[in-house]
Every structure is written in C-alpha cells, then in structure tokens.
UniProtKB/Swiss-Prot annotation:
This is Venom dipeptidyl peptidase 4. The active site is at residues 638, 717, 749. It comes from Vespa velutina. Disulfide bonds join 449-452, 462-480, 658-769. Residues 1-19 form the signal peptide. Keywords: Allergen, Aminopeptidase, Disulfide bond, Glycoprotein, Hydrolase, Protease, Secreted, Signal. InterPro entries: AB_hydrolase_fold, Peptidase_S9_cat, Peptidase_S9B_N, Serine_Prot_S9B/DPPIV. SUPFAM superfamilies: alpha/beta-Hydrolases, DPP6 N-terminal domain-like. Glycans are attached at residues 44, 66, 329, 504, 577, 693. Expressed by the venom gland.
Length: 776
C-alpha cells in the first residue's frame, strides 16, 4: 500500500503532469517575477477563495523537471510546444534538436527513449493500463541515422522495453517472456528469446506480478543490466499457487458489448496465504547460448518462503540481491559473482519492527547504506548514512556518518572526484523538512546542508528538496518543493547554480489572486508522545469565532502527512471557501521521529495511530475555544479510510461527529501479504491472529452508531478490494446502524474517472455535518 500522496499530486489531483514548459518559459523573467512578488506584498489584487473544482483539476499544479541526464553535462527532454526531442548542454547552455517531432506524427506517443549511443529512438504508443505502474504498449524503433522504422514483436502489445547501457541493444517482454534484440550497423536487428516458461497472469519473467509491483519494486521492471550491458539479472515470479481475487467489470451503460459483466481475475496473495515463488537468474547476453545461472537465495537465513526486496549491480562483475524472510524483519544482502557464486553477505536484523533497506552505494573498499543507528536520545534510533567495510572479514566494521536526531530518507549519489556522499534528510528535530546534505565518505567532517542555502523567489529558505544527479555527480538538478511554489535549478558540484530551469511564474501569478490558508504548526503531547500537528486556518481567521474542524488522516506506518511541500488542494478549498479548519496529525507509527515512536505500531495496526488521532483532536478542542467540538469530522483514503472508520468505532467520547472512509481496508485479512505481514506478522494462532481480529473494523461497528458515516469505494479497485467495504457495510447493516454508501462502478483505487462526483458528494456531507450552507 502506497500513501495516496505518492500518486495524488497536490492533495486531490490523481494524475501527474509530466510536461514542462518550453525553453523560453524556463528562463527566469526577473521583471515578471518581481512584479508578481510586489503584487503579493502590496495586496493590490482582489483575492478570491479556492473553489471546489480546483481540487481535482490542474489549475494549481506546479511544473517540475521533465528531463533525463544523458551525460554529466547534457539533459534530454521534450519541448511540449513543438514536440521536438531536445538536448540541453548545461555548460554551454545550448539546445540541439535531436529528433524532430514529425518522426512521431503517425503515433499517439506515450513513451519514448533514446538508445545510449543516440542512434535509435524507441517509441511507445497505443497505451493499455496494467496495474498501478505497469502498462502495455506497442513499440516501434526509429533509426535516426537511416530514417527507417522497425516494429517490435510485430506490433503486439508488450509489457516492457528497455535499452541496455552503453549499447544499442534492447530487452523487451512479451507475454511474460524476455527477448533480446541486437542491432547491426546497417540497422538490421536480431532477436533471441531468453525465457520460454512465461504464462500470462501466472508466471512472470522480467516484470513483477501484482504484489511485487505494488509493494516491493514500486514499478513495472524486474530486470537489471550490468553497467556495460553484457549481463542481465532478472527476477521470475511463479504465481501458480497464489489465489485469485475476482471482481466484475460492468462496462459502459447501454452498450450491447457489455450486456454481461466481464470477470477480472488477478493473482493476489492475501495475508497468510501462498506468496509467489520468486527466483533470480543471471544471463550472459554475449553468450550465443544465453546460458542461465541461478542466483540462489540464502534460504538458511531467510527461509524458502522469502521475499526478493532489491537487486542492483556493484560493478561489471558483481550483482547484489537483498533477500528477506516472509515477515521482513530479517534481510540478507548477498554479493554474487558472474558465475553465481556467493562471495560476500551482510545480515540486517530488526528485533523491534521491520527492515527497510534501499539501494547501496560504493566507494573504494566501502559500501554505504541507509540504516537505523542509535541517536543517544529517548527517541531511539534514526536512519543514518552508514559506512561498511565490505572486504572479506567475519565482522564488517560500520561507521555512522550522520549522527543525531536526523532521519536520512534516501542516498542520492557519491561524487567520486571529491569524495562526498549526497543524501536527503530531515533537519535535526524537523520531521516535516527534507533537504539535500553532503558528508565526506570518510566521515572526517560534519554533514553540510546544500539546499538550506537556496532561497525561493519569496525570500524563504528551501525546506523540502529533491535532487537528481548526473551519471558521475558533476551536476545535479535541485528541486525545491517548499515552503513556496516549486523552483528547479541546475547546479555544478561546487554548488554553483548554472541554470534556472523552472520558477513557476504562472502559478505564482495565479496564487497572488487567491486567498491562502494560515498555517499553525504545534506539538501536542498525548499517550506519552509528542504528536506533530498542522492546522490550516481560514484566511480571515478570528479567534473570537468558532469553526468546524476536519481532520484528514492517513497514519500508515512510516508515513507522514505533515511535510513542507507547497500544495493547494482540498485543504485550501475547505479553509478559504468553507471556513473549516483543516488538520493533519502525525502520531505514533509516523516517520522521521525515531524508532521508538515508529515501531509503536508494529504488529498492532489500527490501535496506537488511531488512539493518537482521537486523543490529540480532543486536546486541540480543549486547548482552542475557536475549534467547535460539536462540529469535528474526519476523513481518509485507503489506509486513511481504514483509520477514519476505526476512529469512529473507537471514539467513545464523541470527539468526532462524522466521518468519511474512501476505499478503506476494513480487515487486514483481506489485504495483500507482503504489506500486511511486514507490519502485522501472520494471521495464525501461533503468531498474531489476535492482533488481526482486534484491528478488524467490522468487529467494532457498534460504536459507530449515532455518528454520521459515509463509505465510498470503487467496484474495480484491484488494490483495496471492494470486498473490504462490502464486509464493513454488511456488519453495519446486520447491526441496524445507519450509514451512507457510495459505489463507483468500475472505478479503481484512485477514483480518477469520478472526481467531480466524489468531491461534490463529500462537500454535501460536510455541509450537513457542520451545518454549513450548501455550495453552488
């Protein structure tokens, strides 16, 4: 389960705008920018509140970086005005047209990729959706040098096509089998089939099945090239023993083609049931026989029912795999040579919770990883950049390079020429922030914050950043996402800004004409911990008045609602238009505050995080007379929908009057195995069946009686199945408890096709609950 914010951009918008502006509009127009900021400061414009329709449209989306580094000095991207594929030289600040848009005129292009040598253009078209990340497309290859087109797989829909590094060779996957395509100098290609046992929907080679795509790889690829492209590691998933989820697709109303509903079947392992059998294979692509080598899992450590959590290449000769036991509290990092022999291992065991390891980085005789380390405080351990000596020895020496109460969220790059490692982390004691830091690879100096010195056009220091480094770390794109609208710049490795890519002048101009909510951050002590709270207040807030409050909850393990990203979605509408206080609460189980608070949720989902939402809300009502305790509601989506329903079921003192659960989990026995067992263990009497039963909302419906409750779900949800809401609805109906229910026919988890109806439905619900006038 991925927090909805991961695919909902700016709170309520369920698509990602991939396009960026043309080169002309990326250049900073200082006069325009100064004029916009002067207008904001001078309050010269009449300002309007946000309207509901802007919650689900692209009106207040920020443009971001849409390029790809192809060398340490060049970026390739699409000019959205002309459709040309351009190359930008960041040193010379010069544009070159690589491919004219006319090359793609005959196709509705949804994907393209240049080959590493720049001769061929891979063009994907005729898109068909797979799961969350996967898609099926037809592909052609355009020969830029000779001008011809070549269909891949005779124009059939394929699941994946990817260029090999350094060469003009290609891997593609058709019907869950892997094919290797090589091109000669005259443009002709030769195709070899690598695997022969793929079965659509059952046995997957090189692409993940549903649960691995959703919960492990968070993407649609399960192939890993060696750095020179000569070898390929690929994962296979055998789902023959995995049980199926079945739901009906009803189709278009009145369409004779849909006279009978269509059955949709997906292999979907639920908690405690059979998982896919995963294997990892290595093949030498330059061997005419394509001989395969099995990279065996360390079953003596992780067991036979294991999870392949990550794969990467260390160098030309070694591939690394991370294998976990089924419940994911033990991980073995294994180094294999090209003959399939295990040459090194590293164990990571977590006794208080679960193991979470991301990519490793290498420098000389050391490996760098993100790992929990003691902080010397009551907060427990934090994820830090940790250096290991991976030379052969019985007990590798480790060094914590980033000590203290700072949470490293990801390692981004190593600059080998300067001996520094770059990473994203919170500031000390600032869990809502994320900045780019660097530290020497030997730990000889304290970390330095790189992005903290970047100022937004409004004059504020950047407090939430991301970075995309060039292949060898000589340049990087710095994306400042908050506290103000996004800015994007290109920097060299001395941190000198060499180009301003995007300043979002249009968005800033529109915001100058809008009322913005006031923001109040505070900590509230409840249940032995300090929970962080962010309140969005109406722009014309008056302490002498009383306002309804709406708590928006997610509260999934290791997530945070409160982050310093500038966004203008549903909360902006509710505060400026409906005069409702909008609240986020990050309590126990949330990220960035140390292992003690994080692991409080372990093996007991639906308990401590729910209790904190209730307790903190009660304290807020007691602290601030301007919060109307008789007009307080809660809503959430996915895990947040589960929490919304559980909050109403556990709220015995009427802290909340009403709530909405969108696409909720109602019982963890219905959700997928890899996510659920990571946090809950197994639903068996020997393990944690009692924990599962105790967190089943359908077993606790009696205390929802008397509260306004709305249950919303799409019948085509392949992630949190409609079964979850139907089970909860059945329990409510059996108990004769009144509630409202909305079913969105054939809609998936994001309800993308019905957003206007969804938000208008919720608006009417809050109007009734909070005694507001109905919006027009």
């Amino acid at each position: 389960m991925v927090p909805l914010r991961s695919f909902v951009l700016l709170n309520g918008l369920f698509f990602v705008l991939l396009a960026a502006r043309t080169v002309v509009t990326r250049v900073i127009d200082k006069d325009n920018l100064d004029g916009i900021l002067e207008t904001q400061d001078g309050q010269n414009l009449s300002k309007e509140p946000f309207n509901l329709e802007e919650t689900y449209t692209a009106d207040f989306l920020a443009y971001t970086f849409n390029g790809t580094w192809t060398s340490d000095t060049t970026i390739v991207y699409t000019d959205t005005m002309t459709g040309d594929i351009l190359q930008f030289d960041v040193i010379k600040q010069r544009l070159t047209v690589i491919v004219d848009s006319s090359v793609m005129d005959d196709y509705i292009v949804t994907h393209y990729a240049l080959s590493p040598k720049g001769r061929f253009l891979l063009i994907g078209y005729d898109f068909q959706k797979g799961f969350r990340h996967s898609k099926f497309m037809r592909y052609v290859i355009y020969d830029i040098e000779l001008g011809g087109y070549d269909k891949i797989a005779n124009g059939m829909h394929i699941a994946l096509a990817k260029w090999a590094p350094l060469t003009d060779d290609l891997i593609y996957i058709l019907d869950n089998d892997i094919y290797y395509m090589r091109f000669s100098n005259n443009g002709f290609n030769d195709v070899q089939r690598v695997t022969y046992d793929g079965i659509v929907g059952i046995v997957y080679n090189g692409v993940p099945d549903w649960v691995y795509e959703e919960e492990v790889f968070h993407g649609s690829s399960a192939i890993w090239f060696s750095p020179d492209g000569s070898h390929l590691a690929y994962a296979s998933f055998d789902d023959r023993n995995v049980q199926e989820i079945l739901y009906l697709h009803y189709g278009e109303p009145g369409n004779l083609v849909d006279q009978y509903p269509t059955e949709v079947k997906i292999k979907y392992p639920k908690a405690g049931t059979s998982n896919p059998v995963v294997s990892l294979t290595l093949v030498d692509l330059h061997d005419p026989t394509l001989n395969k080598i099995d990279l065996k899992a360390p079953i003596e450590v992780v067991g036979t029912d294991n999870v392949l959590s990550n794969v990467q290449w260390k160098d030309f000769d070694h591939v690394i795999a991370m294998w976990s036991n089924r419940v994911q509290n033990k991980t073995e990092i294994v180094w294999y040579n090209k003959y399939g022999e295990i040459v090194k291992t590293l164990d990571v065991v977590e006794h208080e919770g679960w193991v979470e390891i991301k990519n490793l980085f290498f420098y000389k005789d050391f490996v760098y990883m993100r790992k929990l380390q003691p902080s010397g405080t009551k907060a427990g351990r934090f994820h830090h950049v940790t250096r290991y000596d991976y030379t052969l020895r019985s007990s590798p020496i480790q060094m914590d390079l980033t000590p203290g109460i700072t949470e490293v969220q990801d390692i981004r790059a190593i600059d080998h020429s300067h001996g520094r490692i770059y990473y994203l982390a919170t500031g000390p004691g600032e869990p809502s922030q994320r900045n780019l830091y660097s530290v020497p690879v030997d730990g000889s100096e304290k970390p330095t914050c790189i992005s903290c010195n970047v100022l937004t056009p409004e004059g504020n220091a950047c407090t939430y950043a991301d970075a995309i480094f060039s292949p060898f770390g000589q340049h990087y794109v710095l994306i400042c996402q908050g506290p103000d609208p996004m800015i994007v710049g290109i920097f060299d490795n001395t941190h000198k800004k060499v180009y301003s890519w995007e300043n979002n002048l249009s968005l800033r101009s529109k915001l100058a004409r809008r009322e913005l909510p006031l923001v109040k951050d505070l900590y509230v002590r409840a249940n032995g911990y300090e929970s962080k709270v962010r309140l969005f207040l109406p722009h014309n807030f008056d302490e002498s008045k009383s306002y309804p409050m709406l708590v928006n909850v997610y509260a999934g393990p290791n997530t945070a609602k409160i982050i310093d990203v500038a966004s203008y979605g549903y909360h902006a509408y509710m505060t400026t238009n409906r005069s409702v206080i909008y609240a986020y609460i990050d309590g126990r189980g949330s990220s960035n505050k140390g292992s003690k608070m994080l692991f409080e949720i372990y093996r007991k989902l639906g308990t401590v995080e729910v209790e904190d939402q209730i307790s903190v809300t009660r304290k807020l009502q007691e602290m601030f007379p301007w919060i109307d305790s008789k007009r307080t509601g809660v809503w959430g989506w996915s895990y947040g929908g589960f929490c919304s329903a559980m909050i109403l079921a556990k709220d015995l003192t009427s802290v909340f009057k009403c709530g909405i659960a969108v696409a909720p989990v109602s019982s963890w026995i219905y959700y997928d195995s890899i996510y659920t067992e990571r946090y809950m263990g197994l639903p068996t009497p020997e393990d944690n069946l009692g924990g599962y039963n105790g967190t089943d909302v359908s077993r606790r419906v009696e205390d929802i009686r008397g509260k306004k409750f709305m249950l919303i779900h799409g019948s085509g949800d392949d992630n949190v199945h409609y079964q979850q809401s139907l089970a909860l609805a059945k329990a409510l109906e059996k108990a004769d408890i009144m509630f409202e229910q909305i079913t969105y026919t054939d809609e998936a988890h994001a309800l993308f096709g019905v957003l206007p109806h969804l938000y208008h439905t919720m608006d009417r619900f809050w109007s009734d609950c909070f005694s507001l006038s109905h919006a027009h």
